[in-house]
Amino acid sequence: MIENFYIGKKKVGKNCPTYFIADIAANHDGNLDKALELIKEAAEAGADAAKFQHFSAETIVSDYGFKSLGNQLSHQAKWKKSVFEVYKDASIPLDWTSKLKEECKKNNIEFLTSPYSIELVDFVDPYLEAFKIGSGDITWHEIVEHIASKGKPYIIATGASNEQDVNDIINLASKINNKICIMQCNTNYTASNDNFKYLNLNYLTHLKKKFPNLILGLSDHTHGHSSVLGAISLGAKVIEKHFTMSNELNGPDHKFSMTPKSWKEMIERSKELESSLGDGEKKIEDNEIDTVILQRRSIRVNKEIKKNHIIERGDLDILRPCPKNSIDPRNINKIIGKKINKDITKDEILKWEDLD
């Protein structure tokens, strides 16, 4: 793995700003104009990339397979249509691709997509600077290897997977192409606040220890900013969240998506966090230099002292402020018993040059 790669002109990874992906996914609701508007809004809200999904219902789901499960499960239980029909409605016509790419270019935002078949990987390749692989394909090594072979950066989400799944995909794919980002992800799309307890953001810490040079990320489906801020503080350099114009719209992804307003807030809070993380070295910061003088204490004499006086503890007070040429209190035992080489006025600081 490598610590940095470029998506277009933007450097991603170590010592770089967080890269934000607005996952439009199915929130275009089958309407090209809405898709184009979402790109524009995502760019204005501060996203680095607008991501779509390239699939046809026939190449991603089995109508028979889902119907044979009986009842639709999890978030799909609320769908009024069959799984096959929902995916059919959410699919992107291939002739949209160039239009989406052009709109992204026009708005200075990167065009990304997740292709869900080998053929679609080849189709979208000319339009992409990087690939995104959804969590559901983490065990489809064939498509991951094919994407990795393109030589471009690729981002893999790890929702609904275990340690072995993640280890397998990292070891497999990184041998082909080391420009890889692994995203912690929880793939529950119910928009329930109960989902926070399943995010397991500390897995990022585990990955960081196990693969020190691996670029980490978070693909998130919870409300608010806390999960994103937590992930960034734990080392995530790529953040993906769904993006919509309104959470009140009907569709599979709108309820847990970010709006332009909440996206802008997320970017602002994230920049504040990034600025506050620092380099990990404890030091007196530039904006604290005056505070050292104001709040630290110095050693002062509490009476008028004559030259050749031998200092006793009772001669001294420990008081603010602490001028740069003063002696700080940690040295008090070094001063007691020393001889004063000049007269000192009450309340004056002691300086090293005052002592023999």
How would you label these PLM feature ranges?
Residues M1-D356:
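Catalytic cores and adjacent flexible loops of soluble metabolic enzymes
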